[in-house]
From Swiss-Prot:
One Gene Ontology biological process: tyrosyl-tRNA aminoacylation
SUPFAM superfamilies with a match to the protein in the record: Alpha-L RNA-binding motif, Nucleotidylyl transferase
All copies of domain S4 RNA-binding, residue ranges: 343-404
Entry's localization field: Cytoplasm
Superkingdom of source: Bacteria
Catalytic activity: tRNA(Tyr) + L-tyrosine + ATP = L-tyrosyl-tRNA(Tyr) + AMP + diphosphate + H(+)
Top EC group: ligase
Example GO molecular function: ATP binding
Organism: Desulfotalea psychrophila (strain LSv54 / DSM 12343)
Motif ('HIGH' region): 48-57
Keywords in alphabetical order: Aminoacyl-tRNA synthetase, ATP-binding, Cytoplasm, Ligase, Nucleotide-binding, Protein biosynthesis, RNA-binding
Protein name: Tyrosine--tRNA ligase
HAMAP family from the UniProt entry: Tyr_tRNA_synth_type2
Length: 405
């Protein structure tokens, strides 16, 4: 494949970005890289506080992949040191720090998931404890001298906490400095972060400049809205699509995205070019292409990315069978169990891994989201007799056949 022109590279890199600080610096860095043959160092940092990645995280990963495809060095930085502090960005109170063991476990989970997107042969995985744990007390104090409390209180989250009398710990003030120091240690040319990280990634530019390094270009990307179309995608809000979810789940959840949000997902998640996306939008607005077909194309693309083309086709067929034909999945999962007495329905749902807990099971029953052999379950205290088989459906897409042995 021919290398895109400089203009095409800039267009690709800026696609979906909120900030590019600065474009002139980016152009100069790309030109110098092309002339010298030395790839740019492009980093994005992830604190391993929530180990399961969802599509919201992949907005940054997709941008890293674009740089990777252009021949640059991608650094996937795992903030194992900063993860033990806890990023205060956007928080109304001090976050509970993770233990060393929790951070290490979560970091390993991250590493297994990111290579669903990034090429492992072209990715450097770094841990910021490598350099941060070696900083002396003198160096830490010197680092702290480069930022004033007044500037820190310019941050909306800190300002709100200060004005409302909520405590702010000194270590939280240190977080942007420590994150910024990562760029110094890695001599980064470009850093990518969410819009909520703007203050922190700009700190990297300041620290590089004060140490005689060329300041990194900062690219900020928007926070992807979740399935509710309102709040940012978040596991805690339950509005997320996890990249390790099964193919049927990813496909079905993408189809549930609102028409208004669909092209936002295309822009931030799809590999289609800007022109191809514009063509889809034009066809849809002209009435020659139904919105559902446009959405199905995105669902196939994302399902194939995290599974395979075959899995995406099977998920689409499964969806058609379940929703349009009123059937059940062809590859219906089974759960076999041997019991001597009736089992509480919420417990059965949890045991069969249809819900994460009995409390979630009770909530789903209250919401009318559980059916047994086609009949809606309405009693959360219901006991199931351990005889024969029962087909359980939870929500719109999840089925399991329970076989009592």
């Amino acid at each position: 494949m021919d290398m895109p022109s400089l203009e095409e590279q800039i267009e690709l890199i800026e696609r979906g970005c909120v900030d590019c600080i600065s474009r002139d610096e980016l152009v100069k860095k790309l030109k110098k890289s092309a002339e010298t043959g030395i790839p740019l160092k492009v980093k994005a940092g992830f604190d391993p506080t929530a180990p399961d990645l969802h599509l919201g995280h992949t907005v940054l990963l997709q941008k890293l992949k674009q740089f990777q495809d252009l021949g640059h060095q991608v650094i996937f930085l795992i903030g194992d040191f900063t993860g033990m502090i806890g990023d205060p960005t956007g928080k109304s109170e001090t976050r509970k720090a993770l233990t060393v063991e929790q951070v290490a476990e979560n970091a390993e989970t991250y590493k297994k998931q990111v290579f669903k997107i990034l090429d492992p042969e072209k990715t450097t995985v770094a841990f910021n404890s490598t350099w941060l744990s070696k900083l002396t007390a003198h160096e830490m104090i010197q680092l702290a001298s480069e930022l004033t409390v007044a500037r820190m209180l310019e941050r909306e989250d800190f300002k709100n906490r200060y004005e409302s009398g909520k405590p702010i710990s000194i270590h939280e003030f240190m977080y942007p400095l420590i994150q910024g120091y990562d760029s110094v240690a890695l001599e980064a040319d470009v850093e990518i972060g969410g819009t909520d990280q703007r203050f922190n990634v700009l700190m990297g530019r300041d620290l590089q400049r004060s140490r005689g390094q060329a300041p990194q270009v900062v690219l900020t990307l928007p926070l992807l809205e979740g399935l509710d179309g309102v709040n940012k995608m978040s596991k805690s809000l339950g509005n997320y699509i996890g990249i390790t979810e099964d193919a049927d789940s990813i496909y079905g959840k993408v189809l549930s995205v609102s028409d208004d949000l669909m092209f936002r997902y295309y822009e931030l998640l799809s590999d289609l070019t800007t022109a191809e996306i514009a063509d889809l939008r034009a066809q849809m607005e002209a009435g020659t292409l139904h919105p559902k077909e446009v959405k199905k194309q995105l669902a196939r693309e994302l399902t194939a990315r995290y599974h395979s083309e075959e899995a995406a086709i099977a998920a689409e067929q499964n969806f058609e069978n379940v929703f349009k034909k009123g059937g059940i999945p062809e590859d219906l999962p089974e759960y076999q169990v041997s019991l001597d007495e009736p089992i509480w329905l919420p417990k059965l749902l949890a045991d069969a891994e249809m819900v994460k807990s009995t409390s979630e099971g009770r909530r789903m029953i209250k919401q009318g989201a559980v059916s047994l052999d086609g009949e809606k379950a309405v009693d959360e205290s219901m006991l199931i007799s351990p005889e024969g088989e029962v087909l359980i459906k939870v929500g719109k897409r999840r089925f399991v056949k329970v076989i009592f042995a």
